[in-house]
């Protein structure tokens, strides 16, 4: 699969042959869904909790005698049916993460890359080094490339000026190649890879 390489200013910088085993697969929605679910579950803090009837500050004295009143039998004001009582079967602090095989995670990344290539929303740029960290200049560059919602993947390190200029732009995410992930790829309309990122990905899946 051959793809044209562009510059940040919209000029041509040659072409690149992409590996079909990484960028040419038929995307499977089920694999992508499993990976997104895995990522979102893993990032949950799981710190949700409520007070049950042993935690609330209520008297444990019996409200009234057991028999003879005609009312229902009650033993404590901390019961869930009373105002201020404890919550029954409420959420507790727990870990939401679940396992997903390493091979499935790797395959999901290939399918995410392939989905962008198949829908022509994959752009390869030669480099993302810039001289200025001004956001206004970066917005003008992105307008030339037609980018309004994009994930930009640099090499092992992202140019500092580029990162500072892009971080204030809505719907533009910038990551080093080791931070590439399925969820961030799918949540943006366009995926932008540098030549170094493509080389690193092909080396990773060799």
Curated annotation (Swiss-Prot):
Biological processes per GO annotation: translation
Molecular function per GO: rRNA binding; structural constituent of ribosome
Annotated Gene Ontology cellular component terms: ribonucleoprotein complex; ribosome
Pfam families, A to Z: Ribosomal_L4 (PF00573)
Alphabetized UniProt keyword annotations: Ribonucleoprotein, Ribosomal protein, RNA-binding, rRNA-binding
Entry keyword annotation includes ATP-binding: no
InterPro entries given in the database record: Ribosomal_uL4, Ribosomal_uL4-like, Ribosomal_uL4_dom_sf
Signal sequence interval, chain numbering: none
Coiled-coil stretches: none
SUPFAM superfamilies: Ribosomal protein L4
Keyword rRNA-binding: yes
Highest taxon of source: Bacteria
Known partners and oligomeric status: Part of the 50S ribosomal subunit.
Family to which the UniProt record says this protein belongs: Belongs to the universal ribosomal protein uL4 family.
HAMAP family referenced in this protein's UniProt entry, alphabetically: Ribosomal_uL4_B
Function: One of the primary rRNA binding proteins, this protein initially binds near the 5'-end of the 23S rRNA. It is important during the early stages of 50S assembly. It makes multiple contacts with different domains of the 23S rRNA in the assembled 50S subunit and ribosome.
Protein name per Swiss-Prot or TrEMBL: Large ribosomal subunit protein uL4
Encoding gene (name): rplD
């Amino acid at each position: 699969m051959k793809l044209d390489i562009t510059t940040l200013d919209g000029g041509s910088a040659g072409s690149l042959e992409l590996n079909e085993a990484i960028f040419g697969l038929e995307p499977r929605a089920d694999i992508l869904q499993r990976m997104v679910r895995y990522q979102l579950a893993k990032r949950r803090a799981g710190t949700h909790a409520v007070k049950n009837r042993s935690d609330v500050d209520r008297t444990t004295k019996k409200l009234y005698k057991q028999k003879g009143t005609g009312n229902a039998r009650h033993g404590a004001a901390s019961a869930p049916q009373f105002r201020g009582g404890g919550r029954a079967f409420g959420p507790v602090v727990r870990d939401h993460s679940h396992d997903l095989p390493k091979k499935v995670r790797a395959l999901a990344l290939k399918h995410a890359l392939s989905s962008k290539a198949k829908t022509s929303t994959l752009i390869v740029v030669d480099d993302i080094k810039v001289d200025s960290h001004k956001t206004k200049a970066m917005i003008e560059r992105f307008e030339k490339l037609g980018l309004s919602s994009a994930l930009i993947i640099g090499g092992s390190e992202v140019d500092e000026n580029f990162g500072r200029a892009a971080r204030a732009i809505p719907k533009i995410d910038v990551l080093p190649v080791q931070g590439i992930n399925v969820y961030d790829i799918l949540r943006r309309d366009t995926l932008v890879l540098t030549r170094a990122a493509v080389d690193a990905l092909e080396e990773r899946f060799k």
